[in-house]
Design a protein with these regions (language model features):
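Positively charged, solvent-exposed patches that mediate nucleic-acid binding
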Residues: 1-115
Length: 115
């Protein structure tokens, strides 16, 4: 993912967590906040509840790829944070992709509804 499309500063992550809306799924948590830009920015987090460093990095790679496959449908102007939950590495690829797609749809970012 290009650097200009990523959330990088802790200030941005804190702002999305503080001011944004959240949508939950057993595999991941989605936080969104308007960013008043012409493009979206994405951030992926995996805490220690996911497992050790290898498990956290694997979870982030899998979520990043699932988000990448769904992101063309996302409308512009949002900061999106996806937080991995415990069972994310045990889930199959289609289940994970469906979870991310469902979270984006629930948030109204899939292009079918304007938020």
């Amino acid at each position: 993912m290009r650097r200009d499309l990523r959330l990088t500063s802790s200030t941005d992550f804190k702002r999305v967590r503080r001011d944004g809306r959240s949508y939950a799924h057993p595999l991941a948590l989605l936080l969104i906040s308007p960013n008043h830009r012409t493009s979206n920015r994405f951030g992926i987090l995996a805490g220690r509840s996911v497992g050790g460093a290898v498990d956290r990095n694997r979870a982030k790679r899998r979520l990043r790829e699932a988000l990448r496959s769904c992101s063309p449908a996302v409308g512009d102007g949002w900061d999106v944070v996806l937080i991995a939950r415990g069972g994310v590495n045990r889930a199959g690829w289609e289940e994970l992709r469906a979870a991310v797609s469902g979270l984006l749809q629930k948030a109204g970012l899939d292009g079918s509804a304007n938020s």
